[in-house]
Amino acid sequence: MKIAVTGGYSSGKSSVSAVLTTLLDCFFISADIACKNELQVGATGWQQLKELWGPDYFSEDGEVDREAVREKIFLDPASKKELEAILHPLAHRQIVDAGLRADVCDKHLVAEIPLLFESDQSYDFDMVIVVSVAEDIAISRAMRRDDVRASLATSIIASQLPLAIKEARADFIINNDGLFAATYSQILFFVADRIEKKK
């Protein structure tokens, strides 16, 4: 089974994905990690971004200035679209390849894709999990985890599809508002109800 894990900003997608990978015989891929890899010096995404934006967003040794890029894309919607137009197709290729490897090896695929519904890329998943969290909790967690200002966290959330729309498109919703023990119980139920029953 090919499973996508998505949700809002700082909702706990990585935590849910990590648990799933311990419970399932699966391959795992993260769209965020795939995109970060594409911004490593010399990678295809890095080359395309440097050609598009020039040297101002790169350090002297060629590294992408991630903080400067983050500020730019969330203050300038056009820049965000430019970056996504570079990275999303490259990440998509990696995710599709991971799915093919999973098929060959008769394993599940767990793919963490934060912008699954916002992306123009087409995917073929058997199950889409949306990790849901209240906006005030997401902002608080983002400020602790990413050391960002509340205003930036709010703008990131506003730049994505409303959570209600994501939930409406989900095959399964995991609420992560409270203690992670409650979240873990929901993941166990998902595995038992949506995967084990289908064997």
From Swiss-Prot:
Pathway: Cofactor biosynthesis; coenzyme A biosynthesis; CoA from (R)-pantothenate: step 5/5. The gene is coaE. One of its GO terms (molecular function) is ATP binding. It is found in: Cytoplasm. This is Dephospho-CoA kinase. Keywords: ATP-binding, Coenzyme A biosynthesis, Cytoplasm, Kinase, Nucleotide-binding, Transferase. GO terms for cellular component: cytoplasm. Residues 2-199 form the DPCK domain. InterPro entries: Depp_CoAkinase (IPR001977), P-loop_NTPase (IPR027417). Its main location: cytoplasm. It is an enzyme of class 2 (transferase). It comes from Desulfotalea psychrophila (strain LSv54 / DSM 12343). Catalyzes the phosphorylation of the 3'-hydroxyl group of dephosphocoenzyme A to form coenzyme A. Pfam families: CoaE (PF01121).
